[in-house]
From Swiss-Prot:
Name of the encoding gene: nar1
Keyword 4Fe-4S recorded: yes
A Gene Ontology cellular-component term: cytosolic [4Fe-4S] assembly targeting complex
Example GO BP: iron-sulfur cluster assembly
Keywords linked to the UniProt accession: 4Fe-4S, Iron, Iron-sulfur, Metal-binding
Function: Component of the cytosolic Fe/S protein assembly machinery. Required for maturation of extramitochondrial Fe/S proteins. May play a role in the transfer of pre-assembled Fe/S clusters to target apoproteins.
Protein family (similarity comment): Belongs to the NARF family.
InterPro entries: Cytosolic_Fe-S_CAF, Fe_hydrogenase, Fe_hydrogenase_lsu_C
Database matches in SUPFAM superfamilies: Fe-only hydrogenase (SSF53920)
Species this protein is from: Emericella nidulans (strain FGSC A4 / ATCC 38163 / CBS 112.46 / NRRL 194 / M139) (Aspergillus nidulans)
Name of the featured protein: Cytosolic Fe-S cluster assembly factor nar1
Length: 590
């Protein structure tokens, strides 16, 4: 297990439940038939040494004994060691540029001998790296590309000298999620489709685990869209598999994310090729994950350290054109690696992807003259938004809830009112639901009621994704500075709260400065209207669906399910068979 996983590094960490329903089966040793009867003394009986218990990520997702992800206990194999072992286990399928910008397989390797390695990186990871090394977000991006794909990075060592053929920015697929989110909210307002209002964002896996295990009444409200990480995995595996004729099992996708919960998301049974590959259902093989491995920002440092590579000493410039492979499909290559910026990472959009902000901008574009009114809640992690018409009437209400303390308040507001068992009792509705009276707003809805929202952006970490549990901490940055600057003394004391807040502000600054780091030749986002950007994304998604011959419903959407607890229930006669079935599912044995 990675040594950097600990409860001290997590925000709003809820420790694992005392009752774990994952049974540890201890079978007696098989006795030899040569001597069925033997007389011996007690002191000569050798004590049994049971093997260490192992719990897979899939087992964790099937358990409701823990509230969130229990990162410090269960996430062991999705680490930098798994990346190194995979790179050394099988050679890389070498790819070269062909005619018309396509990519063909090098004749020196056969498809059965190796794998195609691809990686995706979130903007929060780049911001964390930029703050640590004192570089710009753009330079941090170049460092990551040089490390994963360049000749001085991973390719400089290892058994096969393998590296990653493509390194994709998750912002590209985040654009698709943003546009589809606005569509989903619009459809929910007309009552034409699920989910129920208010729609709750589903990109945070810590929040999803919490809802599935403790509050199943929340599930009808969850957005059905995949997260940018999951959508990127589906995108890469479907297109590469279709265009190059390589099975999904030969494509290995590494995702670098700001939090440990993303490891759990990658282990979800719903996020495999079984959801989109029509052939996989008839094949006896285990379904293939869309995201094979997830590491965090700090684990990226451990990965470089394991190979003896100093990240800040790598070239802070883009890879030469000769080392950059075009994506197999020209249209999708432009979408993934476009030099034009179509969205801006501003403080108004937040540090978690800007789902809520984009919904507001989309509806504002449909209502000329409207204005976005912001009202802060009890703390900085709760913000209410109202889109007001020129006449002062509310068009759309939305909110942002970050951190489990605030999430619990949101859940209480959404919880259905208890039905009284007394004969003749009135059912609590509207303003009296929950046993408390609420003031009435001008449009007739109870003021402050979350049921009045059309959309709520929910994230488990206070401050958003730049404050994820896997981000580089101020202590790590101090250690790095002490190693590379003799004038800086290493501090062993735990950082004070104000120092931690200052460090988070530094990471946020790097995150928001991503647009200012871009070249002057890059098109300003203000020249691209919201409507034009939505049309561009819709055309790209239609093209993706057409070339893969897979409906967009299977590519971009997912499902959720209630996780029932077995704690305190009597053991059923077939418990053993149930455990065997559970362990045999996708990811079993991890």
């Amino acid at each position: 297990m990675s040594a950097i996983l600990s409860a001290d590094d997590l925000n709003d960490f809820i420790s694992p439940g005392v009752a774990c329903i994952k049974p540890v089966e201890s079978l007696p040793q098989k006795q030899s038939n040569e001597n069925p009867y033997e007389v011996t003394t007690e002191d000569k009986v050798q004590p049994e040494n049971p093997p260490p218990a192992q719990i897979s990520l899939t087992d964790c997702l099937a358990c409701s004994g823990c509230v969130t992800s229990a990162e410090a206990v269960l996430i062991s194999l999705q680490s930098h060691n798994e990346v190194l072992n995979t790179l050394d286990a099988q050679p890389e399928i070498r790819l070269v540029s062909g005619e018309n910008g396509t990519v063909i397989e090098d004749s020196g390797r056969t498809r059965d001998e190796g794998r195609i390695f691809v990686a995706s990186v979130s903007p929060q990871v780049r911001a964390s790296l930029a703050a640590t090394y004192g570089v710009s977000e753009k330079e941090a991006n170049h460092i990551i590309h040089q490390f994963l794909s360049g000749p001085n990075g991973l390719r400089a060592g290892g058994k096969h000298g393998s590296g990653f053929s493509w390194v994709v920015d998750t912002n590209s697929l985040r654009e698709a999620v943003l546009v589809l989110t606005a569509d989903e909210v619009s459809e929910s307002l007309t009552g034409s489709s699920a989910p129920k209002r208010p729609i709750l964002s589903s990109a945070c896996p810590g929040w999803i685990c919490y809802a599935e295990k403790t509050h199943p009444f929340i599930l009808p409200h969850l957005s059905r869209l995949k997260s940018p990480q999951a959508l990127t995995g589906t995108f890469l595996k479907t297109v590469i598999s279709k265009k190059l004729g390589v099975p999904a099992s030969r494509i290995w996708h590494l995702s670098i994310m700001p939090c440990f919960d993303k490891k759990l998301e990658a282990s979800r049974e719903e996020l495999t090729d079984a959801a989109w590959n029509r052939l996989s259902s008839g094949e006896p093989n285990t379904p293939v994950r869309d995201v094979d491995c997830v590491i965090t920002s700090r684990e990226l440092l451990s990965l470089a350290s394991s190979r003896g590579i100093s990240l800040p000493n790598l070239p802070r410039k883009s890879l030469p054109q000769s080392l950059r492979l075009p994506f197999p499909d020209p249209a999708l290559n432009v979408f993934l690696f476009s030099e034009k910026s179509f969205s801006r990472q501003t403080s108004a959009s937040g540090t978690s992807g800007g789902y809520l902000h984009n919904v507001l901008l989309s509806f504002q574009a449909r209502n000329p003259g409207s204005e976005i009114v912001t009202q802060r809640g009890r703390n900085a992690d709760v913000v209410d938004y109202t889109l007001m018409s020129p006449e002062g009437e509310p068009i759309l209400k939305a909110a942002r809830y970050y951190g489990f303390r605030n999430i619990q308040n949101l859940v209480r507001k959404l919880k259905p009112a208890r039905v009284s068992r007394l004969p003749g009792a009135k059912v609590a509705t509207g303003q009296t639901a929950g046993g408390r009276r609420q003031p009435i707003s001008r449009n007739g809805a109870s003021a402050g009621s979350s049921m009045d929202y059309a959309y709520v952006e929910v994230m488990a970490c206070p401050g958003g994704c730049t404050n994820g549990g896997g981000q580089i901490r101020i202590g790590d940055a101090r250690e790095f500075n002490a190693q590379h600057d003799a004038s800086v003394t290493s501090e062993t004391s735990k950082p004070l709260p104000h120092e931690q807040r200052s460090w988070l502000a530094r990471v946020d600054e790097a995150y928001y400065s991503a647009d200012s780091d871009m070249d002057d030749a890059v098109e300003d986002v203000r020249t691209v209207s919201v409507t034009d950007n939505e049309d561009r994304v819709h055309k790209t998604l239609q093209h993706w669906s057409a070339i893969t011959d897979i409906p967009l419903e299977k590519l971009a959407y997912t499902t959720y399910r209630e996780v029932e607890s077995d704690v305190g229930k009597p053991s059923a006669p077939n418990d053993t068979s149930r455990v065997v079935e559970l362990a045999g599912k996708i990811g079993g044995g991890w």
